[in-house]
């Protein structure tokens, strides 16, 4: 909510507070921590600090794997990693995550979903179409 309103530092502070409380309570199951990590990465991207998003997105994907989560739980952080590596100018890593994100979005979102459209369009751009 704060991030959408342009209040990114407040958004980051709230996400960090929730994340710290979850970890303090020993919570590493399910999708809540994964969602917090993924959402924090979006804030870092919006702040122009993509490198700071990498550890949170890596953890989000690890949590998905540890907990047998699929669909958006994997596709969303994968898409955001593609966005991070695009922002960092690492085309090789962007391509790896972009292809995986498109596959994931095709499995869990309808063709008209905005993120699926954006990912497919970016993949076409990367492939020179």
Regions found by a protein language model. Name each.
Residues 24-28, 66-70, 107-111:
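Short coil/turn linkers that connect adjacent helices within long alpha-helical scaffolds
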Residues 92-110:
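TPR/TPR-like (Sel1-like) alpha-helical repeat modules
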Residues 4-15, 24-25:
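Extended non-membrane alpha-helical scaffolds
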Residues 3-4, 31-46, 72-83, 114-125:
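Conserved alpha-helical positions within TPR/SEL1-like repeat arrays
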Residues 40-43, 56, 60-61:
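Fold-core signature of tandem repeat domains
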């Amino acid at each position: 909510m704060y991030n959408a309103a342009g209040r990114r530092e407040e958004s980051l502070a709230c996400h960090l507070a929730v994340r710290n409380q979850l970890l303090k309570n020993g919570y590493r199951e399910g999708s809540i921590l994964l969602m917090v990590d993924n959402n924090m990465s979006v804030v870092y991207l919006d702040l122009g600090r993509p490198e700071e998003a990498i550890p949170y997105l890596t953890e989000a994907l690890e949590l998905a794997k540890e907990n047998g989560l699929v669909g958006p739980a994997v596709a969303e952080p994968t898409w955001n990693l593609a966005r991070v590596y695009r922002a960092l100018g690492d085309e090789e890593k962007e391509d790896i995550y972009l292809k995986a994100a498109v596959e994931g979005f095709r499995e869990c979102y309808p063709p008209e979903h905005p993120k699926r459209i954006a990912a497919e369009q970016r993949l076409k751009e990367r492939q020179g179409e």
